[in-house]
Amino acid sequence: SYTPELIEGLSEHRDVLPVKEVVLVDINEERLKIMEGFVKRFCQHLDYHVDVWSTDSRKEAFVGADFIACQIRVGGNKQRIFDEKIPLKYGVIGQETTGVGGMFNALRTIPVMIEIAKDVEKYCPDAWIVNYSNPTGLVTEAVLKVCNVKMAGLCAGGMRPRWWAEEALNVKEESIYYDYIGLNHMNLSLIHISEPTRPISI
């Protein structure tokens, strides 16, 4: 789950993105209650004052929402293992966002995301859907072709090369120019280190 990372990001940017309420939705009630308890404790730890509750009803969660953050994995981790291992068995990329595994993942995920988007159309038509569900690009494009919603596909992975460069080269964040083109596992990163003693481009 990306929920802890998402909550931490909202907390870090609370001055520019003042969130009042976070509603967690899951089809697995046991997992949902565990995550709700964790998020409440995490918010206390971060001194982040936001109402947190959970439900298994999309209607209940969506009414009045401004943003819907989706991070679903249809078939769970068990299916992800198949997506990654079966292609490898035949000598092709085994991965959840590209190749054969990515396509299988997309074929399972897109119909469910369309159902979710149709509920957004019905219960909160002005809300933005922020999609973290892989393969992000395919899923987002498919939903936008079928549904009348506002939607963006995102991946936190885009910032990782910058962080790795900072650590590997032992440079400060402000000395790095970072340009990122693409999404998820289909991208090009340009990193330029502008410290006077050693200008480097990667």
State where each predicted segment sits.
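Single conserved hydrophobic/aromatic residue that forms the stacking wall/gate
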Residues: 191-202
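Aromatic-residue-lined binding/catalytic grooves and analogous aromatic/hydrophobic interfacial grooves
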Residues: 158, 180-183, 190
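Glycine/threonine-rich flexible loop motifs
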Residues: 77-108
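Metallocofactor- and cofactor-centric catalytic cores in central/energy metabolism, strongly enriched
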Residues: 1-79, 105-171, 187
